[in-house]
Amino acid sequence: MRKLKYHEKKLLTKHDFLNYKKDDNNHRDVNVIRRYHIPQREDYFKYNQLVGLLLGIANKLSLLEPTDSFGNLHKKMLLGKLFDMALLTSTPKLSDVENKLTVSAFCRRRLPVVMCRLKMCETVSTSVKYVEHGHVRVGPEVITDPAFFVTRNMEDFVTWVDSSKIRRN
């Protein structure tokens, strides 16, 4: 190997190639993206931002006094909306927002994952393909976006399109 020039040596002094820092905790996004077949990495980060905003709102509401009518009203509204979106289970509490609201909770409400849970498909990857090809409708509308968010009320209306050959089988 040739002798390094001055500016090359100067750049390499800032890096230690023998002992580099391992990023063991930064693989959560890759695992979630792979498990739920999220095609764009930006979707994961958008969900992460939403979770952060909701945690901030829940934290500010928890700091209010329990006798405050404004705080109680907004706590009920927040918990009601999260329950209707099926991000929280039955009888949610404000502590559930901090403990159970994750990016995976948002990903579990995506249309392909709901289809797998309803036994319409065996795997999430096949259900993503079916959604992209226009074989699935929610109510009267045909959905071609796999990132479609299915709420608790819309879950009953997820069916195959009438002209779909998959429905005939």
Curated annotation (Swiss-Prot):
Keyword Nucleus set for record: yes
UniProt-listed Pfam families: Ribosomal_S4, S4
InterPro entries, sorted: Ribosomal_uS4 (IPR022801), Ribosomal_uS4_N (IPR001912), S4_RNA-bd (IPR002942), S4_RNA-bd_sf (IPR036986)
CDD domains linked: S4
The keyword Phosphoprotein appears for this protein: no
GO biological process, one term: rRNA processing
Any one GO cellular component localisation term in the record: Mpp10 complex
Domain of life: Eukaryota
Single GO MF descriptor: snoRNA binding
Ranges for domain S4 RNA-binding: 109-166
Localisation per UniProt entry: Nucleus, Nucleolus
Keywords tagged on the record: Nucleus, Ribonucleoprotein, Ribosome biogenesis, RNA-binding, rRNA-binding
Subunit structure as annotated in this protein's UniProt entry: Component of a heterotrimeric complex containing imp3, imp4 and mpp10.
Function: Component of the U3 small nucleolar ribonucleoprotein. Required for the early cleavages at sites A0, A1 and A2 during 18S ribosomal pre-RNA processing.
PANTHER family listed in its UniProt record: 30S 40S RIBOSOMAL PROTEIN, U3 SMALL NUCLEOLAR RIBONUCLEOPROTEIN PROTEIN IMP3
Family: Belongs to the universal ribosomal protein uS4 family.
Protein name: U3 small nucleolar ribonucleoprotein protein imp3
Originating species: Pneumocystis carinii
